[in-house]
């Protein structure tokens, strides 16, 4: 077998990439989110041997908030896939090097992984994040009294998150790692969250808070939520509406992606009193032009993974 060569992706690679991702990831990775990116070919590096494509890596430019109140240009790395026949040859390391060379003016690089040892030799270091609260769940009271008509439900789909954009941005101003979402980021979030329930808390004609959640078997998952500053009652109303749906679905445990803020913890003590904060160490960073500034409360939600 010849050594793999690494190059930029081409339009003719799309079918082979989908096949690679279907076998390299568990569960299989759908190309839907990648297809949203109009610049996906320029952002993707592939490895090719004499049997065809045997590896891929995706480097997406993102703007993430930092602890000094600034915004970092970040090279977000994902879809690192190596075919079975090409493993054990250092190909993942070569793919990482290739995408870093294409990072342009990015300040630093970010990835999330369950196998951090693969990336340490490329200069990446892990960091911790209190991203979720998890544990047993049960509906404590007949909630949602008075929320009917103020909390509107719909399934997440194309364009459904447009009404909540302002709420998201204003709620994330002090959260380290939280992306400043552009149109592409919002479209990708709609793909990642597709099919989950979007709960919007309405005050008059204004959205003052929202949540995206779904039951997965007996597990209730809160994927993303936000309320306008000072609208703490909206958070309680959203959780009350979610509780009604989860009770009907037979949810017995929960995983809640909420930042470690006092107002969030207060609401969760009533919603899921037995759930506890989890330490997420799947994130890794590497300096490019400079080191990342990640001091403070960190938060990154499912809609922004890449």
Question: Model features per residue range: what roles?
Answer:
Residues 18-66, 176-198:
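Active-site rim helix/loop that mediates acceptor-substrate recognition in acyltransferases
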Residues 125-142, 223-232, 240-306:
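Active-site/acyl-donor-binding loops of N-acyltransferases
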Residues 108-134:
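Long, hydrophobic, well-ordered secondary-structure blocks that form the structural core
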Residues 2-6:
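Extreme N-terminal starter segment of soluble prokaryotic enzymes
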Residues 125-226:
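Amide-forming acyltransferase catalytic core, primarily the GNAT-like/NAT-type
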Residues 79-82, 88-101, 232-244:
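Conserved acetyl-CoA-binding loop-helix of GNAT-fold acetyltransferases
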Residues 96, 101-114, 248-260:
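Conserved GNAT acetyl-CoA-binding A-motif
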Residues 46, 52-62, 74-76, 81, ...:
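Conserved beta-strand in the GNAT
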